[in-house]
Amino acid sequence: MSFVHLHTHTVYSLLDGFSNIKKLVKRAKELEMPALAITDHGTMFGVVEFYNAAREAGIKPIIGVETYMAARRMSDRDSKLDKKSSHLLLLAENETGYKNLLKITSAAQMDGFYYYPRIDHEFLAEHSEGLICTSGCMSAEIPRDLIEERPEEAVRRMNWYYDVFGPDRFFVELQQHNITEIVDLNRKLVELGAKYSAKFVATNDVHYINLEDAAYQDVLLAIQTGKSLNDPDRMRYDSQTFYLRSPQEMSRLFAEIPEALSNTLMIAERCNVDLGFKGYHIPEFPVPEGYTTQSYLHHLCEIGLEKRYGARKNDPIIRERLNFELEVIHSMGFDSYFLIVWDLCRYASESGIWYNTRGSGAGSLVAYSLFITLVDPIEHHLLFERFLNPGRVSMPDIDLDFRDDRRSEMLVYAAQKYGDDKVAQIITFGTMAARGALRDVARVMEIPIPEVDKVAKLVPNIPGKPMSLSEALAEVPDLKAAYDSDPKIKSLVETAIHMEGTVRNAGTHAAGLVISDKPITEYLPIHRPTSGSEESPVKTVTQFEMGILDSMGMLKVDFLGLSTLTVMARACDMIKQRHGKEYDLNNIPLDDPETFKLLSEGKTAGIFQLEGGGMTRYVVEMKPKNLDNIIAMVALYRPGPMDFIPSYIKRMHGEEPIEYRHPALEPIFRDTYGIPVYQEQIMRASVEIGGFTRSESDDLRKAISKK
């Protein structure tokens, strides 16, 4: 007989669930289960990842949540009366139910959080449409009433749930674990359910995938509670049976109530939610009367072109480039996007807030004419297709840097302009890396800090190239020796290996902000401020991380606070006060010989991207003569291209011959002495030599960048 697990926790039930989503889905596939649910505690962090993994495996994904019910109202916060909350299982039957889950998990975080993200009965009743509800686990209201001998209260609650959900959407949940009181509880639930002709459903409250994972989930709980594994009073599960049991196991356990098994299939068949996101959710930028977003963008570009180029604005190259970009932008539906970013930059400029942009947006003449970017893409041979590829529609991505002491003003402006309910910061998830896993596990195993530090320091810490514990064991002889010689260290390392990659905490992206055309909870759930975001004027955080938001078509803008811009702005203020000269990012001289002399002497302290020891050494060897030399050095100073730095410097000083493999490559690579430094050079070469279109050249660039 087949069976579907409808009560399942993943690693996104933070420090409680030990089920990696991909491994969980893989195991369900091995067990030939037709469907599987995700029901994490109080959040929907993992639902999109789960949905995609399940669909890819050919398993039907069921979206749900195990929410927390407040003892009284979700706004009540009395330490004696409201500290304890109850669990409740909710599954989305359709799109309406999914949207109600978004609102339930959002309200629980934003309005009901008190020890746990809670909702109350009134809120649940208002958002019950499209949801299937069960009586829950042993920590739910009805089971708890029965365990604590309050049968009248259990009946009252049953009546309430039947009134709200009806007999077709409310199920009495039964579980079988090696726990003494659960036998008596199940008897009472069956007796109570019989009075209502209730539908029963079997679940297993899955918290880990395999039986042997119980020990690792126990370690996770100890990490969560900050307790030693040896502490007899710490929170722990009373049974090691909360794994993804097979259909055969579940059939044996519920042989006396077969309908509880078949109902899992019936519920799975009824639950149909499509998370195949379509389109983009960009706010419609408000334009003056008589304009559309398309015509207003064109109008602003013409004004900007006059300021940037003066009489040259009608140069055929400039005119053709502008018209091409505007056509591509409009065909992709991104007119409002550019107006939104323009407006942010306009506000910053008018408010005296220094800003700059980074990334491929510098290849856009539209962005340059709007004073979003400060670099002339035509003069510097920057390609628009590197930014927006006409052959592949994808959301533009312009990262904005603001002076860090005034970044919050920009966030306030965005929230006021588009609405607090349409703006949110972006969540991040911290996972246990090798060293962190060792230290977390050592703490609960009561291994002294000096001992674990010795072991942790044996794991190589290479920026950009994290090494797993398994790799370190294979590659670091001293670590392998400690592992082989000391049983305690062996146990520590083996346990930590299983902990690696487990989600440990939620944080906030340093710069990312979502700006939506509708209240964000129409599309995704939101979260209260996480660690690192408490001081932000934007008090909501998405429950979905960056990559998920991109796949949903949400507008994301990076508001990065940069101390370098603050220092520069203050320096220019001092110059104005002392010398009466006004400088900003548009008119600071880029060819000052004294500046390059200072850099050549290694005086790089405090200079963004140049002040590191290795970089400074190369700058001294290079003795830069112009800004192009500096730009090339910054581009080369990363793993891989760094190998070309000595040749670049020698060729620059005439100490090594410059060679081109084809005469047509000379104009492309002349400025970098025959060395490929920039991705745009590869794109131009593929067009000139390979006959690629510019769109195809960007596809080539992407393919190369993945190698």
Regions found by a protein language model. Name each.
Residues 1-707:
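Alpha-helical scaffold/interaction cores of sigma-54-like transcription cofactors
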